[in-house]
Amino acid sequence: MRPGIRTATLLLFALVTISTAHAQAHTTDSRPLQLSVFGGPTGVFTGLAGGRNLSFTAGVDLGFGTYRGLLPMAEIRGTEPFDDGNVDAQKNALGGLRVVKRLRSIHPYGDVLYGRGEIEYQGVGYLNPAGNIYYQKTNSNIFSFGGGIDLDISPALSIKFDGQVQSYKVPVTVSGELYAKPITLGVVYSFGFGQRHAF
């Protein structure tokens, strides 16, 4: 894992841990169940030989309460390409932790996700560094770190700007890894279990 990603991940988990510990020792805001779904087109820079995909990402977020103005949520999401590009096509399913800070109608967040992914190499396949095997498909565990902003346009709807860095283990690079960078522009629908609040 790259040092920058490792540091940011540790900071995110530390933030959640500190907030939770504080909440256990003090009276905190209590909020109703938070459930939202999101989806939208995703441009993926695959990290392999300039490869690009045009994909669709969809997911669900579930939170149970806020701590000192932070909303920890469980998230699951999946990405499926509909334009595979000329190098490789990446799809994955991920789950993990998302932490949101609600600032009136603007909601920045960070997330740490883990899951499985599949890469299909276009044409006859992709040659390994040793030059003796063409790979047509590989599967890998994925670590994903990223964040974004949700902008409210109504009580139930928001526009999502999301970016991730995703680490795949692959046999077709010298390092044995590649780092994909998906960027999503999507729509969020929040279910009405209670009104949103600004902190």
Residue ranges of predicted features:
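Bacterial N-terminal signal peptides
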Residues: A8-I18
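Membrane-spanning beta-strand positions in outer-membrane beta-barrel proteins
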Residues: G69-L71, H107, G148, D152, ...
